[in-house]
């Protein structure tokens, strides 16, 4: 066996499916602004930058279905479909743009 490298991660062979079994909502999103907009993996998508045009009611309580710590960047004039998944756990949204600041299911 080869010596371990500090901080090295040893993983099992195969693929890891993120958010397996979670319901997915696909929305079309367009950046109508003149600057790029970046949205992180755990940002409450309904509260994303106002320059992004999409169905905000359908995005309520959801986040991007991408790996944790990553983001999607929308260049000016860019349009694309994104997959969203519901927040799990306590489903309480605090902060972001201050539009909810409490439980999603109240």
UniProtKB/Swiss-Prot annotation:
CDD domains the UniProt entry points to: Urease_beta
Name of the protein: Urease subunit beta
InterPro entries documented for this protein: Urease_beta-like (IPR002019), Urease_betasu_sf (IPR036461), Urease_subunit (IPR050069)
Domain of life of the native organism: Bacteria
Listed GO CC annotations: urease complex
Pathway(s) it belongs to: Nitrogen metabolism; urea degradation; CO(2) and NH(3) from urea (urease route): step 1/1
Subunit structure and binding partners: Heterotrimer of UreA (gamma), UreB (beta) and UreC (alpha) subunits. Three heterotrimers associate to form the active enzyme.
Family: Belongs to the urease beta subunit family.
UniProt GO MF annotations: urease activity
Organism: Synechococcus sp. (strain CC9605)
Gene3D superfamilies the record matches: Urease, beta subunit (2.10.150.10)
Disulfide bonds: none
Keyword entries, A-Z: Cytoplasm, Hydrolase
Localization: Cytoplasm
EC number of this enzyme: 3.5.1.5
Catalytic activity: urea + 2 H2O + H(+) = hydrogencarbonate + 2 NH4(+)
GO annotation (BP), single: urea catabolic process
